[in-house]
Amino acid sequence: MIVFDNDASTEGLVETISQGGNNLKAGDTGIVYQQYKAGTALANSTTETSLFTGTSIAPQLVGNMAQAAVATSVPIPSIPAGFLALGTGFSGNIYGTIASTGTPTLRVRVVLKNSAGTIVYTLADSTATSLSAITGTTELVVNFDAVCSATGVSGAIIGRIAVTYGTTATANTVIKAVATSGAVDTTQAYSLDVLATWGTASASNTLNTLIGTIGVY
């Protein structure tokens, strides 16, 4: 297991994380956020909502899983000002369930928020896409990457996302978004999140994240 700050005590890191202080630092790599229990399902709503609502840990910030369990339900690590360097990237994998009635639209996007929680940049976006008819409750898989390609006030990040969902127990459909480059001021601090939005509110339109990870490289 990769451990951040090898010269720091694990006990101190656990305490820092439990107090919400799991901020990234220059040189940090590995899995920095892991949801391991299902959260609240996004259902009967058209409100854009985070896909990370379940119980979580920051596994790479502590020495072992037993100690990591002390720091449950941590926020996704903050990205401090200046952290993003050329080639620095984020990757994420989300596995969950989805069900719908009819063919509603679904949008999933990866965003950066400022300290006030306001979305300031969209790194990757599936856009609102009409789903194929879904039979029963099937799997939902979201994969994304976002890589810094320029730094400074006029910095840039290239992002891509793919959303795979089952139309039946044995057939899948993939929503792919072409990788795009967007302007990002890397001198500012941010938080990263993955958001989903249903186009139609229905109790039958529901999705939930069972497990999910965010990594830094």
Predicted regions and their residues:
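Surface-exposed molecular-recognition determinants
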Residues: 3, 7, 27-217
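Short, surface-exposed terminal/edge motifs of secreted or surface/virion proteins that either
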Residues: 2-26
